[in-house]
């Protein structure tokens, strides 16, 4: 399968099965499209059929010089020979067997608090309660969860634990106890825990930042962008004050204190801010250089829900963001945007491409009372 598109002055050709990405000139771009119906998908290199080549030459010569056309078709042949164009997905028939394999648990998401100190309008967790009662995870439940992870992780050395909510900092003492317990399990079991925490920042202080900088491999800071956007969707529980003003100075200090360790500012865009590229730019202007902003998830009848007719605007925003992304990088003030962080040299391995997301098999969530 071939996927072709043009963006920011680049002609991009993707060969899906091989994972190859080619940046080409106009004549090669058009040649690839002309030849795809003829060549289709091949298991091994083939020659471009003589008739197909002549037909392509005739068609392309209407627009491009004959010498350029010949060179372009030769380049297409080189890519076919290198098995980087028109390749067949040789693993397609193995998907069923692969997904039936016995898996190990690699990661847990600990719902350390089914409670929250903000009243975000789009919260899928119903202000932290997850359509149930408010609760904080006990150390005993968390301890059993870590024991379960070690016992069911097989020979895997690196394990991940996410502290999530609600707002995890509302149960901070248990977070610290579980990190300490996890560290005690590492050497006897030949494991290494990678801890992550997601926070709205309301309860952040220097002690928490220092602990996280020692123990947390990654920190996710929840913020939606511009003040008016953030405060509309992320109000305080009592409706007084600005969550933006409460959290932004803390997040700026926290990000700076990470000193090279992973963090990112994570926002949500809704129908109210389809111009979300402005919010990403706002993150960068605040001094953050690691960021993500995701489309809201919600019922179709919610006023903030994204609708099908919004998609063209959303696609346009990603294009605008790409322009700004390149511009700022050239100016020496670049930033990383999560969805643009694609390693073109080290793409997903075959196992990952076949298995997809590990949620529910390799990655499980644990409620405060110990349910998976």
Residue ranges of predicted features:
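Short, solvent-exposed loop/turn segments at secondary-structure junctions
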Residues: 18-19, 115, 168, 202-203, ...
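Radical SAM enzyme [4Fe-4S]-AdoMet core and its adjacent flexible, acidic
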Residues: 228, 232-245, 252, 256-360, ...
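Conserved alpha-helical substructure of the radical SAM core
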Residues: 64, 71, 75-79, 83-210, ...
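Radical SAM/AdoMet-radical enzyme domain recognition
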Residues: 142, 146-162, 171-296
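Short, histidine-centered active-site or binding-site loop motifs used for metal coordination
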Residues: 16-17, 28, 126-129, 163-165, ...
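Accessory C-terminal segments flanking Radical SAM cores
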Residues: 1-30, 338-372
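Flexible, acidic/Gly-rich N-terminal and inter-domain linker regions that tether
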Residues: 1-106, 118
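Short, compositionally biased low-complexity segments
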Residues: 43-56, 119, 150, 285-299
């Amino acid at each position: 399968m071939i996927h072709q598109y043009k963006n920011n002055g680049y002609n991009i050709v993707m060969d899906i099965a091989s994972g190859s990405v080619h940046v080409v000139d106009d004549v090669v771009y058009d040649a690839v499209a002309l030849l795809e119906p003829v060549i289709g998908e091949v298991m091994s290199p083939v020659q471009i059929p003589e008739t197909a080549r002549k037909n392509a030459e005739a068609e392309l010569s209407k627009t491009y010089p004959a010498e350029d056309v010949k060179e372009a078709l030769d380049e297409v042949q080189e890519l076919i020979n290198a098995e980087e164009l028109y390749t067949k997905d040789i693993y397609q028939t193995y998907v069923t067997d692969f997904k039936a394999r016995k898996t190990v648990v690699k990661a847990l998401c600990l719902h350390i608090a089914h409670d929250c100190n903000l009243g975000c309008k789009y919260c899928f967790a119903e202000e932290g309660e997850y359509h149930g009662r408010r609760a904080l995870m006990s150390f005993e439940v968390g301890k059993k969860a870590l024991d379960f992870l070690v016992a069911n992780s097989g020979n895997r050395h690196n394990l991940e634990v996410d502290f999530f909510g609600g707002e995890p900092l509302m149960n901070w003492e248990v977070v610290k106890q579980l990190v300490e317990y996890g560290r005690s399990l590492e050497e006897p079991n030949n494991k290494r825990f990678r801890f992550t925490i997601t926070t709205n920042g309301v309860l952040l202080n220097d002690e928490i930042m220092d602990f996280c900088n020692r123990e947390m491999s990654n920190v996710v800071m929840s913020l939606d962008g511009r003040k008016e956007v953030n405060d509309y969707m992320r109000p305080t529980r009592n409706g007084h004050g600005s969550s933006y003003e409460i959290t932004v100075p803390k997040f700026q200090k926290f990000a700076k204190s990470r000193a090279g360790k992973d963090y990112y500012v994570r926002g949500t865009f809704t129908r109210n801010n389809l111009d979300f590229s402005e919010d990403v730019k706002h993150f960068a202007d605040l001094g953050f250089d690691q960021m993500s902003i995701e489309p809201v998830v919600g019922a179709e009848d919610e006023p903030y829900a994204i609708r099908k007719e919004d998609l063209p605007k959303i696609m346009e925003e990603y294009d605008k963001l790409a322009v700004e992304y390149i511009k700022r990088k050239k100016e020496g003030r670049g930033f990383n945007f999560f969805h643009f962080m694609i390693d073109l040299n080290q793409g997903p391995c075959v196992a990952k491409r076949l298995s997809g997301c590990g949620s529910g098999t390799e990655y499980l969530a644990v409620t405060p009372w110990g349910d998976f």
